[in-house]
Amino acid sequence: GTFDRYDEDFERKIWSSTGVNAIEFNGLTDLANAGVFGEYTYHAGDKFSAIAGLRGDWFYGQGFKVSPRVTLKYTPVDEIVIRANGGRGLRYATPLVDNIGVFSTGKEFVGAYNDHILEDAWTFGGNITYYMPFGASSNTYVSFDYFRTQFAQQMVVDYELGHNQIHFYALDGERSYTDNYQLDFSVD
């Protein structure tokens, strides 16, 4: 488990045409979680392996949450490796700590900048690698990866919503995702 204590104490003065806008924030935040993790590994010769993991965490103020994950690896022939994996990730958002650059903008903070929501995301994807029979060693390959992260709960720092303002808000289940593609070629 972890125990993080954030003592956030700041005073910002923002000069504008309407005068000085002062924001003061003094907050001591304790973010605690305790958990246990276990995994099982299965091998079917040299062709297939699977790792299944399960993590259970108690989050302060949120209760007990379960985070499963699985990794699969299949090698149909020596030159080709296929991998797939997926799982859930949970963490407390720390909007000001995670986005320290907002202090240098001179913009007003609006919304939940001092909230520490529990972010919840699922990531899944895969990889296929083909090892090529040339180069100085057997490590010459071409590889393609695709991964998607789908957020069920996410803290957003929005620089675009308001003029001279930075908005902090939780998506609360609204659509938020990332898709990552990568093609890699390596000659050794």
Located regions from the model:
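Residue-level signature of outer-membrane beta-barrel architecture
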Residues: 40-42, 56, 64, 72-75, ...
